[in-house]
Amino acid sequence: MNGERCSNPDCGSLTQMTSKIYWCDECNIPIFDMDCPICTSKGRYIASDIRPVFPEENMLISLILTGDALHYQKSSAWNGNNNYIIDGKKVKLSVSTINKWPIEKVKELKDQYDMNAAKLDYSYFDEYKRAFIAANTDRYNAITEEAVHYVQQYKDRYSIDDMMVSFSGGKDSTVTSHIVNTALGTNKVLHVFGDTTLEFPYTMEYKKRFNRNEESQGVRILTAKNREKNFEELCDVVGPPSRVMRWCCTVFKTGAIQKTIASAFKDKTSILSFQGIRHSESVSRSKYERESDSPKITKQKVASPI
């Protein structure tokens, strides 16, 4: 794990900058130390970022790559650096090729998935998940402690009323919320949820479940939403969003959030927004500072604990 000290003199903690993830062939799981904490075997470098492949996705890639819905069901399946990693071996799957499939082939894949969905089994997934957690507990505790200390150093500079968590309903903002609540010992920090009107139903359902969770009960979530514009109607007028013209974010996200913040914080001259930005998300985000002034929203300081 490479790292550097936080440039903030009030902090000075070790900031995790990049990850090196290894594979333990003995335990058949990803590990963050070269020596496996469980079996002490030497790991081999596999990726710089990793995420689990859940059984539903596992079944899909099994169908796409082999035609057998259960082919990888008992395997340790992960995704890192845009590669699937099955039992420690990188497996290529071209998303661009799949995007070019005729609709009939996509429907056929969906039919095959639906026919086999009842066979989904979480037991193997859960087994590898438990092993992964056991092997990487020390690292988890270390980065959690560092992130908590990072948030705590803002207590002398901002009051709770001057802070907010930018909450998207995704895993990164959920972790950020947990870190902030833990570090400050309160769930009184305002959360702002940007409803772009294009959110997945699962995201909206998770937002409801988040508030029912014991830890986050009582967290106040304000929803920022542009209720005056319609996405499809604007597409007819100016064309769909593209890399050249990204009007969607400005109209349906940034603009709505800025209005909500202006209303919620009113006469505040400086507010602190905790955001779930990670360096490993993309090349552009790998260049972000951990603390910066928001380029899009005025009088907002952005801090990224994770």
Question: What residue spans do the PLM features occupy?
Answer:
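ATP-dependent adenylation/nucleotidyltransferase module used to activate substrates
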Residues: 2-34, 38-45, 49, 55-67, ...
